């Protein structure tokens, strides 16, 4: 039927029409090849913003370093990193004055965290720069490798399991004259295959010991590896992001804990909360400004954008902030927190894989690793690359570039938010001492500024003053990219405000559909996404019902599980028809087994298995929930799982969904091609690590799991736990005498083996 599109909007308030402007239908762009060029761009831009600073040389590593702090005063219109220490300190002092006790309380909270955090905190997170192998690894492996190397070099404080003790080892490692590490390498030899009689290349993985002198070790400890940020929409150019090594991570974690604690107490901070909580917090600030702007006052809002936030921030400023925030605290605490910014002032950016060269005439491809860029002849490069390399050559050491100014992306989000809020805080009338005043919202580098004044001239004066105050602490508001509107319409962190935050439902569109994990998880995630959007994003009942029907259709096409009585022919239809005919209660069949859909918008919160359980044939129940089914390799399934949901804009979010373990919750097997590469040794380490952790969890189920106190190894803990459990089971009659004796014997054998080792 033909619909006149204007009819759709007859009863819709204008702000709800935002969902029709959705630009992001296709896949987001991904990067290929090396990120070396993007990293060099970052390095040269960062130095350019601070070029009038003072040059010094790091005495330990020999790296040239540029310090723009307290240098020339910043200029209007030109982005720069010339922050002034006294201005930052004064902003901090005023922030404390308007929030009495805020720093003191946050320090106390953080001190508690510092003393309790275990080193396994560092296993969270994805790819991490592993300094022992000089490339990225999963966080858990990188940590295991670091600890292993520390212990073989006589650094053992980490054995207590506390993060703070691991950090003591990090500090000591930097004073050592040399560190011995184990690296993986590959040997290739040509051998004749017995079966096919062809020559094949056989790869063997070796481990070899290598000594790093103090300078090389320090360079690695201070290195941030760089990658290209993927899936960024709305940008023509890609950009580099950084991943720090294990030496830096722990220190950063504590600084961010302190900053998070401060942000939680600041009404202008958009971090660390999210979602509806964030919207409520922000709406409060707007309400305050609107109600306080009397009838005579004008109120305007700037949807703000800062030029190159990270590249103009400076770790030395963060050091000044921390020194001020912790000024009345114990010496050890101040030292722990000041190490992260000091390490960042001496950081090195790893340039990545290097450049790929192709010779069209000779059909040759070769890679120039980053290490060679310092002394290769530049005639092979095109104009723009040549300029880039020439510019950063003086900064190169061992394939890394010295990068003292600037913060790499995403490192100190919370602390930089505190800096931004401290400037917003200065907008109160008691500080501006004139008729205009301002307030606003800050979330990492994103901000919204609300200015009130008696007339347009006052608004202009207020904006100018805010702009210049920001300049003094290294924040550069972009005049080109920020725009001003009457208060009541603005955008902040992809939330659109028009007399209240507008639900932009279309942003969630990419997360509708079938995830492709397995039949069980996909059904659960699909209905949860619809449910969540009804709660949070104004997804109305009729639209939700339609979304649900489309989802079921999509799901049936994906898994080829059309209803048993359908005419559609697929690879599975023969089996599903047979099942349909054998089943007495057809309503009990899961959708993935050709059953009908029983979901509607009222019961989206119930997992499908539970929804249909009473309707199922008994033998079907038995097959469906059978942990011994040999065709299903089971993960042990928690009652709640996490799925990663991709909205169109902003970071991927984790979403909880209910997981009921059935024979549909299969896990695909790992691709085997990795087993023939140099990654293999690492993969084996990782599996070993995984097995140990799983075993440990079997002994200490989460309900009874108290973090181990005192120093005992995992093995000792498990043995003593096994003995206690066995005794309890024996005394209550759950375990026979012979079994009990056997358990005790095994425990003794394990201890004996440990002693011999």
Swiss-Prot record:
Pfam families assigned: Flu_PB1
Catalytic reactions of this protein: RNA(n) + a ribonucleoside 5'-triphosphate = RNA(n+1) + diphosphate
Region of interest (Promoter-binding site), ranges: 249-256
One MF term in the entry's GO annotations: RNA-directed RNA polymerase activity
GO BP terms: DNA-templated transcription; symbiont-mediated suppression of host gene expression; symbiont-mediated suppression of host mRNA transcription via inhibition of RNA polymerase II activity; viral RNA genome replication; viral transcription
Domain of life: Viruses
Region called Disordered, residue ranges: 49-70
Family recorded in the similarity comment: Belongs to the influenza viruses polymerase PB1 family.
Name of the protein: RNA-directed RNA polymerase catalytic subunit
Organism: Influenza A virus (strain A/Turkey/Ireland/1378/1983 H5N8)
Source species taxonomy: Viruses, Riboviria, Orthornavirae, Negarnaviricota, Polyploviricotina
